[in-house]
Design a protein with these regions (language model features):
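Conserved anion/nucleotide-ligand pocket segment
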Residues: 170-233
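C-terminal motif of bacterial Sec signal peptides marking the signal peptidase cleavage site
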Residues: 20-23
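ATP/nucleoside-binding phosphotransfer catalytic cores, i.e., glycine-rich phosphate-binding loops
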Residues: 285-375
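Bacterial N-terminal signal peptides that target proteins for export
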Residues: 1-11
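Bacterial lipoprotein signal-peptidase II cleavage site
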Residues: 25-32
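Internal helical hairpin/lid segments
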Residues: 239-294
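ATP/NTP phosphate-donor binding region
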Residues: 36-119
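Short, acidic/small-residue loops that bind anionic groups at enzyme active sites
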Residues: 139-163, 170-176, 305-308
Length: 375
């Protein structure tokens, strides 16, 4: 592979008299800055929301489980440090039935509040857990498409990504207040920030023993396996299209339940519509079978389809959760020496070497709590 020249990509933003430096992070995080080259634009059927600029408003909402207001306020401070203006949903901070961040009506109301305010340019969810499936029938695809803006989150927020994709709007599978509140200076946070500002990652991944080689292009769908599979057949089901690149991650699930969910996708014809598969983190998942890993088990299932499989993408509930643009046209290239994931959308392309990115280890118990699988 040719050596690429390293550039320091920086954009100077001035907001409220403060000059800020925004970039795709730094070389220590394993990020290389090549000369920007225009990429093939997104297909007309999928709208890419406008990238953010200094002073733009970002709404913080809680569509699933509640998040302590302390975390929300710390996240707001992080956003201010990025030169953005945070606004907090009217119902954020409420607790219903011991877990939910408000009633169904209140959580839907906060989504509509954020979507309907033209001054809000992005929406960051505070936490996953459980609850977005309760909102599916209370939202319409038309209202999501009427005001396209970046929706950010993962885990239970996979349901909202499915709704956004079905509405024809791209969204970001990325970190939330439960993580941003730690300071927002790690690679997981800064790459998500940079993506919101128009710096699009092009991921270079190391070789993985369970990879299946090949190249494929399609629309990126998926997320947390046990969240999006129950949405099959609903208006939040983004797997109904063709030419899919399926992303899957999980936390705290047994191997047999992961197999069950994948079999459901198989029986519903989803895997037949996939051009490729990306396997993310399977954090704290079971090892009750003799495969050795979840990836090894899924390799055996997916090898029958003759499609490329990219294993080990650091996205999901692991120690690193790198951002993905859901609903975007992407290309994966899986080779013997590694793999590449590229988003075919406009923006400044930034090469990210995932093997060089490190983060503070999140204890397994903390990951399970954030996923809503433990108290």
């Amino acid at each position: 592979m040719k050596q690429k020249r390293i550039w320091t990509l920086a954009a100077t933003l001035t907001f409220a008299g403060l000059t800020m430096l925004t970039s795709c992070s730094n070389e220590d995080n394993g990020i290389v800055y090549p000369t920007p080259t225009p990429e093939k634009p997104a297909e007309p059927s999928q709208v890419k929301p406008d990238y953010l600029k200094a002073g733009d408003k970002v709404a913080l909402i809680s569509p699933s489980y509640y998040t302590p207001m302390e975390n929300v306020e710390k996240t707001a401070e992080v956003l201010r440090g990025w030169g953005l203006e945070p606004v907090i949903g009217p119902n954020v901070g409420k607790v219903v039935d011991g877990r939910y961040a408000g009633t169904v009506a209140e959580r839907v109301s906060d989504i509509r509040w954020a979507m309907g305010d033209p001054s809000v340019k992005a929406i960051i969810c505070n936490r996953g857990g459980y609850g977005t499936i309760q909102l599916i029938d209370h939202l319409s695809l038309a209202e999501l498409k009427a005001s396209p803006k970046w929706l950010v989150g993962f885990s239970d927020i996979s349901t909202l990504h499915g709704l956004a994709t079905r509405a024809g709007v791209m969204s970001i599978h990325g970190t939330m207040s439960s993580f941003l509140a730690k300071g927002g200076t790690d690679a997981t946070s800064t790459l998500m920030r940079d993506l919101l500002l128009g710096n699009v990652p092009r991921y270079e991944l190391p070789a993985h023993e369970q990879n299946i080689e090949g190249q494929a292009s399609g629309v990126l769908v998926g997320g947390n396996l046990c969240t999006f599979v129950p949405n099959l057949g609903s208006q939040a089901d983004a797997t109904q299209g063709n030419d899919l690149i399926l992303f899957v991650e999980e936390v705290g699930e047994s191997m047999h339940n992961i197999d069950r969910q994948m079999r459901i996708l198989q029986m519903n014809g989803v895997l037949n519509r996939c051009k490729g598969v990306i396997l993310g983190e399977f954090a704290d998942c079971g090892t009750e079978f003799t495969y050795g890993s979840v990836e090894a088990m899924l390799h055996e299932m997916l090898k029958e389809y003759g499609i490329p499989v990219l294993c080990g993408f650091p996205g999901g509930h692991g120690d690193v959760n790198l951002p993905l643009v859901m609903g975007a046209p992407v290309t994966i290239d899986v080779r013997a020496d590694g793999a590449t994931l590229q988003f075919n959308i406009d923006g400044t392309q930034c090469e990210v070497r995932t093997a060089d990115i490190t983060a503070t280890v999140t204890p397994a118990a903390a990951r399970m709590v954030m996923a809503g699988k433990h108290e």
